[in-house]
Amino acid sequence: MSRIVKKGIVKIDQEQDEETFRENLAVQRNASAFFEKYDRTEVQELLTTTLVSWLAAKDDARSQLETPCGLMSQMNNAGFSTAILLTPVDPTALLDYREVHQILRELAIGIYCLNQIPSISLEANFDQSSSCQLPPAYYDTRVGQILIQIDYMLKALWHGIYMPKEKRARFSELWRTIMDIDLDGKPQTTKNVFSEFSSAGLVDITNDPDFNGIYDEDMNEDPTYEPNSPEEKAVFMKYAESIMMKLTFSTVQIQQHENIFIFETAYWLSNAIKYNQDYLDICTYQRLQKRLYLQKKVIQKHFEKKKEIRRGMGYLKLICFLIPFLLSLKRKMKVPYLNSLLPPFSDDKVKTERELPPFIYGRDFKCQNFDYKQHQYFHVHGGIEFDISTHPVESALDEFKKNVEKIWECASSASAEDAGYKEVYPIPVMELNGKSYYVIHFELEIFYQQLYKTQWWVAINETVNNLKVKRLPLTEDQLHEQFKKKFGLKKAMKCKSIPFGVKSAVERGLSAVFYTFSRKTSSSTINVSDEAGYAIFHHAALHNRVSVICQLWSANFNVNQRRFIMFSQADSSKVDMKKERNGPTPLHLAAQACSLEATICLLCFKADYTLTEKRGWMPIHFAAFYDNICILIALCRKDPSLLEAEATAENQCTPLLLAATSGALDTIQYLFSLGANWRKTDTKGNNIIHLSVLAFHTEVLKYIIELNIPELPVWETLVEMLQCESSKRRMMAVMSLEVICLANDRYWQCILDAGTIPALVNLLKSPQIKLQYKTVGLLSNISTHVSIVHAIVEAGGIPAVINLLTSDEPELHSRCAIILYDVAKCENKDVIAKYSGIPALINLLSLNKESVLVNVMNCIRVLCMGNESNQQSMKDNNGIQYLIQFLSSDSDVLKALSSATIAEVARDNKEVQDAIAKEGAIPPLVTLFKGKQLSVQVKGAMAVESLANCNPLIQKEFLERELTKDLLKLLQAFQIDVKEQGAIALWALAGQTLKQQKYMAEQIGYNLIISMLLSPSAKMQYVGGEAVIALSKDSRMHQNQICEGKGIAPLVRLLRINKIPEGTLLSVIRAVGSICIGVAHTSNPMSQQFVVEENALPVLIQLLRNHPSINIRVEVAFSLACIVLGNNSLKKELQNDEGFEYSDVLYLLHSKDKEVCLKAGYALTLFAFNDRFQQHLILETGLITVSIFEPFLQSSVETERAMAAFQIIILAKAIIDVEHVTLYGRGIQILADSLNSVHAPTIALTGNIIASLAHSRAGIPEAFVSLGTVQRLCYHLYARSEEVRTACSCALGYLTYNAHAFRLLLTECRNKPNQFLRITNNISKDAKINPAFLKEFQLQQRMGLPSLSLERNGGPPVIPVFKKGKEHRQKTRPKIQPRDSLTLLPPVTNVKELFRTTHKANISHNTFSFPSGVSSDIINVSRPRIAFLNKLGKDEQKANPDPPAFLNKLGKDEQNANPDPAESQ
């Protein structure tokens, strides 16, 4: 560098022109003006920093300094006059050339003249404002503005608070006045503090659209850790004042070819805690680090969302390279030629803020990182630093070398274009090597003084020398003023004590103050240690005070100074001061506190980076453990061998092993990228996996898993730890697995493949309750997978889990119940029952802990699904009474869950149904529907459905309690699942008789029925179809009303839906047919026409021919027969227009399914009923032989024989191998014999068939009469079954059109007058009876009946009648009495179900079973993700002899407290 001129402007001789003189004068004036922007204190700081900087050009110093690694020590030939820089482009935030030139100009002045590199540190003032502590050379510069802008946004995201620049600049001037701050920094105002800040422009940062909702996302992947728990917040706030969040930039790649430099930079977000180990132990540090890591993740994810921030980061990356580049040029005696740069910004455009106003939280602010009191404002702290060491310089790639000329052309073209003023000065961009690069160039000049000319750096240096004499050192008043401004009056007074003042100045970074103290005080006084043994050098390194370090080094202080401590002698009253031989050096503390500038400075001062402290740690071990990547980079660049340096004491860990121990994930990733040896282990054989597990750093484990290195088998290592003898290693392995399995949906498979399950099952047999608890917690998290369940069963896990149910820990019971729940869902119900699982679970129902009861009942519910033996076990072991008692609990969850459990215990098991009803379940179930919780009512409806299914007595009891009204309310709910359950429960109460079903359908009403048909729910559609069948069966009035109410269209619409469940489709098809057919196989032309007009025939024909289900096809055939029954025009339309042929049905007669075959015959029977032409068509289409019907005619099932007899009578002329007369006789004889049956369904069916045949063909009624049918029918009028009485009355009604039957029945009624009443009371409204018969009987009645004359004369009645007492009379009339009561077939069953047996009258009305599983709702299993150990032993165990006594407390006292993560570990 040029020798500084000592005095004034160089005198010019006569040959020097006047212009040179003016230029020199202007340079001198500009140099003086440069310092005018500083006040006195700032000038003093500027001068001190400039004079003491290790970057100062001192010949005696340079020989003793080591040059930072990379560019500064490796730059090749610098004989070029123009530098060209290439750096990658961010197309979303383009840089501006004028800004770049402004930055270059400011850096040149700061580095070449003032020996300062840019950085920023926000420091706390005593009044809670924050000082923007820039190197004084960068006050009022564009560099300073960018640093403040980026750092402020970093702190804004960290705290969730923001104030725009213009508003905060104004508020900085006024806030002290508004708050009425006193000399101690305390506010004296009575105003609302937050309101004042808010009105000044302070807002929640989430109000910005770019940052909306950023704190709502949960970054925490460890369920064991609750960062916002009161305990975690309290610990964090204890150290919050000393926690920093800072950005560090480093150049990670440099290539050079001649004067072209290609570089890339990166940045890291780091946190540092400015405490040494005496005040912050390692455990607390890791606790703080865990919370800080989550905060960093949020900032890293959202920091660059705004374009201005991305642009600012682009400038900082450029600055990161320019600093070592300019330092290198300075060493090569080259300096940027500032006159060639674009015009600088005016001074008013580069003003920097000297301080920032405090932050304060509003009540509704989203960020919860800090926990300050309401109306408490606070300062912010952190910074930005640049690593001046760089990656080694490499030769440029061939791609760049080949395009040198193009690069030059691009750079020179930009120079020509930059002339003149522009709003934007774009930087030229080139595409090279597949990437876009900025092409930045600037000219250089020689860094020497020229004769007769004063360069700008010479003028500035001369001004500095002149000011030094005037401004340094500080006076006593100036010292006090500085302390008072930074610390307040009280602490300023304390600072008059030199040791205290020196330490305070070092911690706060007051360079001029320390400079003054060092001039006034001896070295021994300056270097005094504090009570903890730390000297000023240690504090300077800890707080990153480079200027102080430089002054200490200049004063020949030991750069490797160890910590001093006081030892007290046991046998002496003296206290000796002894040097701690293995205490930390300043470099250790700088590495711990992420003091990057201090670290590089100390390395340049030749600090020994191989020294170890008492644990054997070198500085690189500190950097690795405390996750300070930037320090690690600087040290590894200094000496690459440090990458594998082992600690000399304790476990001899490498940096990678220490990083794994502390969970420093960023450092681990960087060390892997450098190729660190991950095979190394400590002295105990622990590798990074073991150490991560033992320290419970699951994030590190997940990273290693994703690396997928075969030699680092995480899963196998965990299994090995599960099987070792150390209880701690087993526990930590289980805890790690518990967290990891929740991190990724596919990890359960890895756990399974590694053979973990047998090892876990073995741990269940351990005597350690905590280990058992953690193990079942892990298993309950992965047992949702079928493969895991199979592995648990194969490893003998079921008896081990059931044995744990006898322990005294409710939390253990809860987790075991979850596992058994999952096991039971995978078809292992009988295995659980085999090991007495159900009695053990029933015993747990006496506990008073809701979370346990929820899981136990869920387990019981699943065990009883479709398992009759388990249902019976619940009854035999007195489990039902607990379930019933829970129905009266105050907990809605228990009410709902007990209802759902009762539903599964009772499903399809009449014995258990009766037992539940006997225990008194019905009253509390009905009471559930009086509450307001819809979810509880839904589960109650589920229980009602299960109990009432095929159980007339329970149905009657529910109906008598008017439950129908409550269930109908569920149909009006908005949620589809609520409607579904309500509909299914209602239809379960409809029972199996037509009368009851018709009553229920009438209660539902036409509107709701049609609404169900229009619903997207298959269950609703099914119930709607069944309701239509019930209403329309044998009731022309209802059929017509459905047609008029537009009920046909929804049915036909459902027929057109492709993806509809088969059971629903069957119901809809039957409903369409049922609407068209009446009593005794009469037709309804009106409804038939409505169906045809809705274009149902083409849809049905398509289903008949194309549907894959044969059950659907045969049902369609039957419905088609109903639609065209007795309607010749529709038959012609069906056959001519729709192409229907009997071959579409005839082949079904040969089906292997007997029910299909019988139903197909029934369909053909309806087509041929009273239609000889159709019988002829059937005969021509296919050959029907009696052998088809023979299996049914000889069947042991009476209803099958009766139906087959009906078919052969109607189809007699279409059967080719037997005379039709023979078939008539055989069929009639079978039907006549069927009337002798003792089974009501057989008699009812036979009566309806006789009614149909009575108006079918001449001669058939006479044949029935000759066989004594009239007498048998009259006998059955006394039957208890209403269906039998109705069917027989209809048959007698139609037989009255036969003269012989007319006379027989008239005689019967004359002799038994009540017989006539029985016929007329029971006959269906749509059935026919001969008017002549009615008229004749009335005539006979008026004339006097023989039986009545006997009674009138005192004789006994012909038929004895038992008269009940008054108390019984009200029960003689059924409560449910709809207008129509005739039945042919139970309409909610298909024919095959009716004909299956004569021994079971109660046939399930469901044509298919709906899933009985429960959707995700209130009764879900309580499956906590993590088993917290602090919950063990907290619940008092006691049996509950009287369950209702404690049920009132459940639901009120159960709170899932968030445990302390430390305790859980």
UniProtKB/Swiss-Prot annotation:
One of its GO terms (cellular component) is membrane. InterPro entries: ANKAR (IPR043379), Ankyrin_rpt (IPR002110), Ankyrin_rpt-contain_sf (IPR036770), ARM-like (IPR011989), ARM-type_fold (IPR016024), Armadillo (IPR000225). The keyword Repeat applies. Residues 1431-1465 are annotated as: Disordered. The chain crosses the membrane at residues 313-329. It is a single-pass membrane protein. SUPFAM superfamilies: Ankyrin repeat (SSF48403), ARM repeat (SSF48371). SMART domains: ANK (SM00248), ARM (SM00185). ARM repeats lie at residues 745-784, 786-825, 827-865, 868-907, 910-949, 1085-1125. This is Ankyrin and armadillo repeat-containing protein. It comes from Mus musculus (Mouse).
